[in-house]
Amino acid sequence: MPKRRDILAIVLIVLPWTLLITVWHQSSLAPLLAVHKDEGSDPRHEAPPGADPREYCMSDRDIVEVVRTEYVYTRPPPWSDTLPTIHVVTPTYSRPVQKAELTRMANTLLHVPNLHWLVVEDAPRRTPLTARLLRDTGLNYTHLHVETPRNYKLRGDARDPRIPRGTMQRNLALRWLRETFPRNSTQPGVVYFADDDNTYSLELFEEMRSTRRVSVWPVAFVGGLRYEAPRVNGAGKVVGWKTVFDPHRPFAIDMAGFAVNLRLILQRSQAYFKLRGVKGGYQESSLLRELVTLNDLEPKAANCTKILVWHTRTEKPVLVNEGKKGFTDPSVEI
């Protein structure tokens, strides 16, 4: 059995060598483990030679740095004194997906310079939900309201003589514009009727900005078709309509498929959407026939060959379990 003195001697001999080997091992691996970062260099690593920088995967260190970046809410572009103002008229009404629809639309409009959002609620008063949402966006907006009388509202029957949803709200916006701007106003502007459930390309707003009288373009997912569009001849003039539903309408076009010069709206003070005696699909014609003829229309979107707006609709949420056993708090705004 080894003596205690012998064990101590072995420990004193082995311990220094163990420490030396450990230090040497760490110093030899350090260059391989270290992340080099030169002063003044971009914290993101450059892609290897020949690699597509858009497909190059950054290191874990870079990903962590991106996650730590604080979110900054985007505000609209600076106002320009040279660009015409686009007045976007949006009727809206209370429903479970209203805030989601308006939020999505606001996120699009935030990228459009010189834009004024005219939001008109179908309600007896302006609702706090819509008021807060508009205020928080930072957009240039006007918040109006007018309630459609119950006996005017559609009941889902195409033969029902009641007016289509949004008619009174769009008319209130037209009245507001005429009361705000004098009839002989020289301020350049364009009026566009944009529902809150559609999807809009940013290119669409730049296309309509140069509207002299009334500009037109295709709209996707309407009339039971992939898209409806004005029919344009070789001379760049609108001569008809590519649609199945009643193609002989004066203006067989969807509400999202045209924009009107502000001066024309101000000068033709009698032009409104008709409340009575208008068949389904004729609301657009009831306004446009008071403003222009077919020959006056200006085809946009590459002579009406590009799709820049989609008549999308959010699926109605199934809330069959709502209110059972107090599972959710009804005071939480959605």
UniProtKB/Swiss-Prot annotation:
Record pathway: Protein modification; protein glycosylation
Glycosylation site residues: 140, 184, 303
Binding site for UDP-alpha-D-glucuronate: 91-93, 122, 165, 170, 195-197, 311-313
One Pfam family, short name: Glyco_transf_43
Active site residues according to the UniProt entry: 284
SUPFAM superfamilies, sorted: Nucleotide-diphospho-sugar transferases (SSF53448)
Broad enzyme group: transferase
Site residues (Interaction with galactose moiety of substrate glycoprotein), renumbered to this chain: 228, 321
Gene3D superfamilies from the UniProt entry: Spore Coat Polysaccharide Biosynthesis Protein SpsA, Chain A
Modification Phosphothreonine, positions: 103, 108
Molecular functions per Gene Ontology: galactosylgalactosylxylosylprotein 3-beta-glucuronosyltransferase activity; metal ion binding
Residues that, per the record, bind Mn(2+): 197
GO cellular component: endoplasmic reticulum membrane; extracellular region; Golgi lumen; Golgi membrane
Interaction with galactose moiety of substrate glycoprotein, as annotated region: 245-254
Cofactor entry: Mn(2+)
Transmembrane segment boundaries: 7-27
Region annotated Essential for transport from endoplasmic reticulum to Golgi apparatus and interaction with SAR1A, chain positions: 3-5
GO BP annotation list: carbohydrate metabolic process; cellular response to hypoxia; chondroitin sulfate proteoglycan biosynthetic process; glycosaminoglycan biosynthetic process; protein glycosylation; visual learning
Catalysed reaction, written as an equation: 3-O-(beta-D-galactosyl-(1->3)-beta-D-galactosyl-(1->4)-beta-D-xylosyl)-L-seryl-[protein] + UDP-alpha-D-glucuronate = 3-O-(beta-D-GlcA-(1->3)-beta-D-Gal-(1->3)-beta-D-Gal-(1->4)-beta-D-Xyl)-L-seryl-[protein] + UDP + H(+)
Keywords: Endoplasmic reticulum, Glycoprotein, Golgi apparatus, Manganese, Membrane, Metal-binding, Phosphoprotein, Secreted, Signal-anchor, Transferase, Transmembrane, Transmembrane helix
Post-translational modification: The soluble form derives from the membrane form by proteolytic processing.
Subunit structure: Homodimer. Interacts with SAR1A.
Annotated function: Involved in the biosynthesis of L2/HNK-1 carbohydrate epitope on glycoproteins. Can also play a role in glycosaminoglycan biosynthesis. Substrates include asialo-orosomucoid (ASOR), asialo-fetuin, and asialo-neural cell adhesion molecule. Requires sphingomyelin for activity: stearoyl-sphingomyelin was the most effective, followed by palmitoyl-sphingomyelin and lignoceroyl-sphingomyelin. Activity was demonstrated only for sphingomyelin with a saturated fatty acid and not for that with an unsaturated fatty acid, regardless of the length of the acyl group.
Protein name: Galactosylgalactosylxylosylprotein 3-beta-glucuronosyltransferase 1
Organism whose genome encodes this protein: Rattus norvegicus
Gene name of the record: B3gat1
